[in-house]
Amino acid sequence: MLRLLRHARRHSTSSSSSAAAAAVPLTSPAFAVFGANTGVGKTLVSAGLVASLLASPSPSPSTVAYLKPLQTGFPDDSDARFVFDRAPALLRRLRLAGGGASTRLVASNHTLFPSPAVDPLPERQDTVVNYGGEEGVEEKALVCRTVYAWREPVSPHLAAEREGMPVEDEEVRWLVDRWLAEEDGGGEVWKVLETAGGVASPGPSGTLQCDLYRSSRLPAVLVGDGRLGGISSTLSAYETLLLRGYDVGSVILEDRGLSNDRFLLSYLRKRVPVHVLPPIPEDPKDDLTDWFSESSSAFSSLKDSLQSFHSRRVQRLNSMQRKSKYLLWWPFTQHDLVPVDSVTVIDSRFGENFSAYKVKDKTIVPQFDACASWWTQGPDSNLQIELARDMGYAAARYGHVMFPENVHEPALRCAELLLGGVGKDWASRVYFSDNGSTAIEIALKMAFRKYACDHGIIVDSEKDIRSEGSVHFKVLALNGSYHGDTLGAMEAQAPSAYTSFLQQPWYSGRGLFLDPPTVYIKNKSANLSLPPSIMHDQLSSCDTCFSSLTEVFCKTRDTSSAANVYVSYISQQLSQYAMSNNSEHIAALIIEPVIQGAGGMHLIDPLFQRLLVKECKNRKIPVIFDEVFTGFWRLGVESASELLGCFPDISCYAKLMTGGIVPLAATLATEPIFEAFRSDSKLTALLHGHSYTAHPMGCTAAVKAIQWYKDPSTNSNIDLDRMKLKELWDSALVNHLSSLPNVKRVVSLGTLCAIELKAEGSDAGYASLYASSLIRQLREEDNIYARPLGNVIYLMCGPCTTQDSCTRQLAKVHRRLQKLN
């Protein structure tokens, strides 16, 4: 362990330090000691807890490991040395008082990385203490460590700056994770990590310590403040921890005669145990031996409550797989194909990673969320914390308020950002709803009304309807499309597994569905695939093969042979449909711009979609972009319309809009679309909504996420010159993947990298189980939580995910596919 930590700085000097995911065992308890302030007695509590643990009768921990990651004022002040010095003496007293077995304690204390300003350097301390008893000998160990130590007795961020020893957050986290993962031989091990200062005191980089240690999410022991004002600081610290997703196992504080403990016991009842310590002597000459003896019952009670907390936590985690199989009904899941032991138990999330509990091993393991939690997630760990804080504020300020005829700041600000971002230069109105499918239904209603007005189906200012019974509206859409699971949205998509009689017996498919040309990467080049329905005799290799996707998106292709073929095909299909369906009207075009998601992660030729939009606008057919999946930097730009080079009349957004943390959707529209609903009658208004329209929490989250994504000070992936994301997936690795013999195609764009495996017959398509073994290996051995679309596997990150992280995950997939060969 010591050698590992000494070499850690070599391996953990950048964000790539988290490359090797540490499995943290829950076979033994581990807690973090936080303080409501500095000087509240965190180290006294740590020492008392350690001594109580070592003195516990069997079964008791054979080893107690104490870690002080950050120490200032060193070596005059050393909390690890205090624990090392005091715990053995306290154990002797407790043993004399309680009897029991003879004990042999092996204790050590060491500082790993002292600042260059620390002089003289302290030596490692080792001691062996024997305590007599009436029974056999118990072997105990106390391992105390200080990781980073600075000389000046100031906040770590100041000490690091002044003494020239900066430490990155990832370095601290890496070391803590390795310490937690270390198992010291046989027997139970308790681990106690003591933080520095208060809950929100800065670490060496300036990151608050409650944020710095959040990745480990150790249950907290909160040392409260018994002084005047301590009630406020204790509760503030408690709520700060809760807001960041920590569990607080216990609160403990000194009785200073101000009844702080009585108030906290009352306020926190049924939430968390509160333990009270006797007053700490103020005489600096007092060695606190008598105080520790007097406090032994409080520390024993603290130890018992923490043990109970840990046992309840593990018991619940162990039961969740089995219970989920009998209580839950998962979407898009055939339960008979999911063994109980394959259910992923998610303890928490931190940035792009799940903390998954492995029931068999009883460990917590970070898993990269390669599904971006079903395409919604955008936050890194910093944005996650910001969203939690802002949403808490919105919930406390607004709760929920109804929206029609009302306005509140989160909704108004969100609308301003939407119109100035994804809706810039074309949209003027924002219609809020709850999710993507609902946003699509609203968009269809908007488009149909506009079409009816433009084509004389609705006449005069009263919106009288001509020949209502004989008018049938259909959509123009693409095969392979997917627009949601509500009935109206399903009618606007082509027949598929999602719309079959088994899933939607009412489905009729109200549209003309065209076969789209697609683009994919194979053998290091971008290739155009044309469906049989599109004639392509006129096309040469320069029309169907490209050196990169950049060429595919180039607008100079508008005058190419491919453009002529597309225009002819689109015009012919629309004309033929109009001639054969006199009473039916193509009243809207609806497309997923650039990428079809649920249909298999296909990249539709942007030239085809651009010309399709142009033709529909020429025919006064309203155009809907379904950007529920593609919007807000999913494809490397804020809106996929930037890639297409054209604007819709209506567009739908959700998922990434709120950072994925809470459902909210918006349908944006042009002013002419809005005008189609205006009159003196309420019956002509858009009568569609839900109880939580524009709910303040969702709008607040969207305001934060939308601004965060595009700000280079918060998102280092933004290329300011082009206002695009930097390339997140290593192009050389993508090309290597595309050249593997078992890979049919690769699509790499923005935050998405999709890989279709070569498969035939029933091994291909949505129902395929072809990728099951690969997915299992990625989850269980590579710590990547992936979920396939049949024989298509994909990795998806957030707009803020580092390039290093993307490269690591993609390299793991590459290695697996090589072995699969």
From Swiss-Prot:
Site (Participates in the substrate recognition with KAPA and in a stacking interaction with the adenine ring of SAM): 332
Keyword Chloroplast: no
Modification N6-(pyridoxal phosphate)lysine occurs at: 655
GO aspect biological process, one term: biotin biosynthetic process
Annotated EC: 6.3.3.3, 2.6.1.62
Cofactor(s) the record lists: Mg(2+); pyridoxal 5'-phosphate
Catalytic reaction equation(s): (7R,8S)-7,8-diammoniononanoate + CO2 + ATP = (4R,5S)-dethiobiotin + ADP + phosphate + 3 H(+); (8S)-8-amino-7-oxononanoate + S-adenosyl-L-methionine = S-adenosyl-4-methylsulfanyl-2-oxobutanoate + (7R,8S)-7,8-diammoniononanoate
PROSITE patterns to which the protein is assigned, alphabetical: AA_TRANSFER_CLASS_3 (PS00600)
Residues the entry annotates as binding ATP: 39-44, 194-197
Protein's recorded name: Bifunctional dethiobiotin synthetase/7,8-diamino-pelargonic acid aminotransferase, mitochondrial
